Amino acid sequence: MLESSSDKIKFAPIKEVDYKKPVSKSKNYTLINDIQPLEWYCHNDSETGYQHTISNKTDGGRGLFRVMKKSMETRVETQTLYFTDLHTGLCGFVQLLYSTVMGGIYKGFQLNFKVFGSESNNTDYDVWESFKLDDIAEFQPLKFVSRNVIFEFLSNKNEKLGSIGQLSIKCDLPTCNNTIQNLKIDLLVDLFQGFKMNPNGCNYYFDKQISMSDEFVSSDKMIRHVFVPRGKCNGNISYDKKLNSGDFQNKNISLTDVPVVYLDAVQGLLPNKAASKWNFLCFQSENYSVLAIEFTTPRDHDNVTVTVWSITEKNKLISIGSSVQSPKRHVRFRATSTDKESGWVYPTSIKFPGGFSEHDLRLVNRYDVLGELPSMVRSLAQKIVSIKPFIYQYCQPSKYKHEKGISIVESTFIS
């Protein structure tokens, strides 16, 4: 019997999970109870490993074709720690980014650092900067060392606390840029139980249609996520921030048992090929964490919406859910506003699965991703590739199950 065209797909998403079932009762996700599954996904990738050397040798036409094919390959992996200080209202993230583009011709690491307040009158610490990292001394599955940054997972379980291990982040960047100087980070994080959706946290993309009945397909082109929805962070962050007067003022942030989220994300294709839009939530309170991430594939890959979320209570996962093409369990914009410059309709009130809503989103950053490009290049990107990427970031006091906390929300529009 011939297969119909409706049995063919170009996108194979993660498995759906019924959030009402008890945690650990589903075969559609894998719980993470030690640090090993948190290792760099790209480290062992023979195509993109940092220590992989690109050969200039070619073997005639086939070698040239291989180089041309590799030139289209791209992969980005980020390991991000979001922190939410419930006492001071200061929030932010420390992110280590690894990228390989043009089949590995360019490879490198970057540190992204952002701090913002949850209240409109708390902007003194606001900063968002990126730093290219040179002099890489070590890149192992669970450890990265450069001249200025150490990012390392430690197998220090604490059964009494319930932690699966620790993450240590140390940074010393004396000369940064014109906005901040002397960035120093010294954090130690206790990580609690995490999870990844099956298969292996991956959503796969295909250039040609494949049969839906093939359960074991995979592709180098993918979106992959590994989640640790709850952790506790202790340590210090300090930097000198440039004031309007031109002088620099020292800022010091002391974190004591501050709730955090850790997220590992891999994107094995260009951003505009992976998704047309994204939504993200990180809510933290004294007892609860609510985490959600959602993306919609472009038209070339069937406009599929994938949503994943979890709820943690007292450092333990109590609910995990995922939805593919089920509108009732996707993110909903309850109220919106139109950006006159970009044309995007962005949320001012939002509802996430898992029972979380925020009716009064407070925009802390509106970022034009192409804004730093020359106007001609930006115009070409918008016209030829049909992309206009904008990120809308929000942070505000919120409630979940009548408990006060702080939520970080992001809505990203690409094409």
Swiss-Prot record:
InterPro entries recorded: Ceramide-binding_SVF1, Svf1-like_C, Svf1-like_N
GO biological process, one term: response to oxidative stress
Keywords for the protein's UniProt record, in alphabetical order: Cytoplasm
Keyword DNA-binding: no
Compartments (UniProt record): Cytoplasm
One GO term describing the cellular component: cytoplasm
Other remarks in the entry: Present with 1010 molecules/cell in log phase SD medium.
Family: Belongs to the SVF1 family.
Protein name, UniProt field: SVF1-like protein YDR222W
Organism: Saccharomyces cerevisiae (strain ATCC 204508 / S288c)
Taxonomic lineage of the native organism: Eukaryota, Fungi, Dikarya, Ascomycota, Saccharomycotina
